[in-house]
Amino acid sequence: MSSVVRISILTIPEDGIDEAAEVMRKAEQELKGIQKLPGLRTYCAGVDRARSQLTNVSVWDSIEHAEQMSRFQPMLDLGKRFGAKGATFLRLIPNFECLWQWGEIGGSGNAWR
């Protein structure tokens, strides 16, 4: 079965990246419902302080499964909070069909660290 990788990129005003990263780190609790969405294989959030960007990278069973994130209200609410602070999103959020991969992609939907 082919996987789909969804990559969301959020650009933060330069002076706000540390605060934004902390908000994203703390948002893990309010976003735990993502783990219950059908088709999720793995999900992670990250920060690139040098480029003043946050990202969410997720792997799904299908494009339809990945597109659930476009309607997941807790994430939409979080995005509005970032937007109110001047953040901009790469739109439309791309969903990439995997052409090949090395290694295993998770499938339990459980958080990993």
Can you name each region flagged by the protein language model?
Residues 1-54, 61-73, 81-113:
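Short S/T/G/P-rich N-terminal loop/turn motif that feeds into the first structured element of a domain
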